[in-house]
Design a protein with these regions (language model features):
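Detector for small/aliphatic-rich hydrophobic stretches
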Residues: 1-111, 120, 124-133, 248-252, ...
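Conserved nucleotide-cofactor-binding alpha/beta core module
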Residues: 102-164, 176-178, 184-186
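Glycine-rich, charge-decorated loop segments at or immediately adjacent to ligand/cofactor-binding or catalytic sites
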Residues: 117-122, 200-221
Length: 318
């Protein structure tokens, strides 16, 4: 019955979208499709709504116990000082790359300036379709005024129609500040991503502080499948994978997907790789099956080494 449940859920979503359009509340709102029908059909606008701010939480598997409030704040601030995790940064870069192409406009990325942290790596961003030439990085000193300055910079950028997307790494935000960002996005038609290092122990979405963001996501890393490219060694990690949890969305329902990023060649070196089709430029998200549904790869027999009659090493399998 799962197929019928998904069909019924998509039908309900379309009916709800028609009703909202009929009431004039959100008719004709533009969106940024993720390119995965299962996700785009589930979201009320057929993708991430523009003229809106979306919240993306960075999961933390190290915090499995329930700490006190002070320990929770310390853990979040320590992670913020060390930088957001790779999964949420890569996921946001992939969304920014899609917005960069779809809206033909530059992307602004706001982050704290910390000596121990490096800036975003251009060649790595290109792997997710984000062109560094159209990326404006705003690094703000990580002092007591960082949050206020970062929120001001994000608000001003969201009001600018010439900006395709605004990413901001912000540790904490209250409801009033998030409403200002949402109002700025609605005024300028901007698309904002709030990247936050929320502790992983906040499994209950209701326990997280409320914001005015249109949607709230939580991103965590998944084991990647072995690389299937002929020019790469076997058993090398393949494309990045994420567990994308939609914790809440206006006019919609929570849901979880497992995604993989497919990069079929937008970097300049792929044409020289053996077995690569230099004419392919497609890249984007794709759904993958949960780990429990994928067949287990057979374990390769390891050779054992023994000594021959003359002291020479002999390898055999079995």
């Amino acid at each position: 019955m799962p197929a019928e449940d998904d069909s019924l859920q998509r039908l309900r979503g379309r009916i709800a979208a028609i009703e909202r359009a009929g009431n004039g509340t959100r008719a004709g709102r533009a969106c940024l499709p993720l390119g995965v029908s299962a996700i785009d059909d589930h979201l009320p606008w057929g993708g991430l709504a523009t003229g809106a701010v979306h919240e993306i939480l960075d999961s933390d598997d190290s915090n499995r116990t329930k700490p006190t409030e002070n320990k929770t704040k310390y853990a979040v601030r320590k992670r913020f000082a060390e930088g957001l995790g790779g999964p949420v940064t890569a996921f946001a870069a992939a969304l920014a790359g899609q917005a960069q192409k779809a809206r033909a406009a530059p992307v602004i990325w706001i982050a704290p300036r910390i000596p121990e942290r490096e800036s975003l790596y251009g060649p790595g961003l290109q792997e997710f379709g984000l062109d560094p030439a159209d990326l404006i990085i705003v690094r703000i000193p990580s002092d007591s005024d960082f949050t206020r300055t970062a929120l001001w910079a994000m608000e001003e950028a969201l009001r600018a129609p010439a900006i395709g997307l605004v990413c901001a790494e912000i540790e904490e935000i209250d409801l009033t500040s998030s409403r200002r960002l949402q109002l700025a996005a609605e005024t300028g038609g901007g698309l904002g991503l709030l990247l936050r290092p929320a502790p992983r122990n906040s499994l209950d979405e209701n326990a997280l502080p409320p914001t005015a963001s249109v949607s709230r996501w939580r991103i965590s890393a998944l084991p990647g499948a072995p690389a299937d490219a002929p020019w790469l060694p076997e058993r090398l990690p393949g494309q990045p994978r994420w567990k994308a949890e939609l914790l809440r969305v206006r006019g919609g329902r929570p849901k979880t997907w497992q995604l993989e990023w497919r990069n079929d060649g937008h970097d300049t070196d792929t044409g020289s790789r053996p077995g690569h089709d230099s004419g392919k430029t497609a890249s984007g998200f794709t759904l993958v099956s949960p780990l429990r549904d994928r067949p287990v790869l057979p374990e390769t027999a390891r050779p054992t080494v023994s000594r021959g009659p003359h002291g020479k090493r002999q390898a055999r399998t079995g």
